[in-house]
Each structure stands twice: as structure tokens, then as C-alpha cells.
Regions:
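Conserved ABC transporter NBD signature motif
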Residues: 7-15
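Conserved signature/switch motifs of ABC ATPase nucleotide-binding domains
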Residues: 82-85, 103, 135
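Conserved ABC ATPase signature
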Residues: 83-87, 91-93
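ABC ATPase NBD coupling module
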Residues: 16-32, 132
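Hydrophobic anchor residue at the start of the ABC signature
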Residues: 97
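Short coil-to-helix segment of the ABC ATPase nucleotide-binding domain corresponding to the Q-loop/switch region
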Residues: 44-51
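Catalytic Walker B motif of ABC-type/P-loop ATPase nucleotide-binding domains
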Residues: 108-111
Length: 175
């Protein structure tokens, strides 16, 4: 457990320090995470990897309904039956994004979502995140890429926080 040294963390309007196990589980279902180096199960197809969160939560029928549209949205329909090692870095990042949003979360946390991809794929991923934001999703992005931040500010970001060694250095729209 991490304990706050100062301030409070509120999670969907509730003090995170006093949430019980059920409330934490409910909050986790409302958050999707796109990891920088997303781990996939190499023996499952990309479609199976993306659907995994629904499958383990007894929502497999929902996965069967939503998966084709989601694969099309991220541009992976043709790669659905491939195994993870067969994908390029950009395809893996799009699969990670699809897996993060398959549960229809309210918040998407993306850790360096464009860190391992070329410029063109970076732009494509940013467009996908922008589309999610326009659907009412909150997008939190952790990145070292100032160019990405500048590009996102005009499309998605309402607020940018600059941190150094865990300390807030700057907050606002100007960077």
C-alpha cells in the first residue's frame, strides 16, 4: 500500500484511503490501462488477448459482440488471428489500447503510448485517444515526449502537469 504524505486522492468522488475492497474493485473496472510495454499471452491470438478482460469477468458474450468493431476501430481486423510475436510494435500498441478499452472504462491511463512506434503510428494512436476523449472518456497520459504533448493539447488535453523527480514543476496549458 502507498500512503499519502500530504493531500488526498479521490477516486470517482470518494477518498481512496478509506475505500473498501469492493469499492476498489468497482473503481478498477472503470479504469483501462495502456502499458508502455504491454504483455500479451503468446499462445493466444490477438483477438483472444484483447477479449481476455471480458472473458475472465464472465462477460464473454459481450466480447463476442464488441470485438469485431473494436478490432476494426484500432485497425487490427486482419491481424485478429495472429499471435502476439507476429505483430509489429505499432500493432502491439493498438492491441494494448483495444484491450484497455474493451471493458468500456470511464478513464484510460496511457503510459508512454507512443514510446515504441514511428511517427505515423504515433499520430494514429493519438487520433484514437482523441476519439475516446470525444466520447467522454478521461485520458491520462504519462510521457516524456514534449512534441506529443504539444500535439495533444490542441486536440485532447485540457490540462498538462509537468513533473520532475515526483514534484510538480508546472501546471496549466502552456509548456
Amino acid at each position: 500500500d502507498l500512503l499519502a504524505r500530504s493531500g488526498k486522492v479521490r477516486l470517482f468522488g470518494q477518498d481512496a484511503a478509506v475505500l473498501d475492497r469492493d469499492a476498489v474493485a468497482m473503481a478498477r473496472r472503470r479504469i483501462g490501462v495502456v502499458h508502455q510495454d504491454c504483455a500479451f499471452l503468446d499462445h493466444l491470438t490477438i483477438a483472444e488477448n484483447i477479449a481476455l478482460p471480458l472473458t475472465v469477468s464472465d462477460r464473454a458474450s459481450e466480447a463476442a459482440q464488441n470485438l469485431p468493431e473494436l478490432l476494426n476501430w484500432v485497425g487490427l481486423s486482419r491481424q485478429a488471428e495472429q499471435l502476439p510475436p507476429q505483430l509489429s510494435g505499432g500493432e502491439r500498441q493498438r492491441a494494448a489500447l483495444a484491450r484497455a478499452v474493451i471493458m468500456s472504462p470511464d478513464v484510460i491511463i496511457a503510459d508512454e503510448p507512443t514510446g515504441n512506434v514511428d511517427w505515423e503510428m504515433s499520430q494514429r494512436l493519438m487520433r484514437l485517444l482523441s476519439e475516446l476523449n470525444k466520447m467522454g472518456k478521461t485520458i491520462l497520459i504519462a510521457t516524456h515526449d514534449l512534441n506529443m504533448i504539444r500535439a495533444m493539447k490542441t486536440d485532447v488535453s485540457a490540462r498538462v502537469l509537468r513533473l520532475r523527480d515526483g514534484q510538480l514543476m508546472q501546471a496549466g496549458a502552456e509548456l
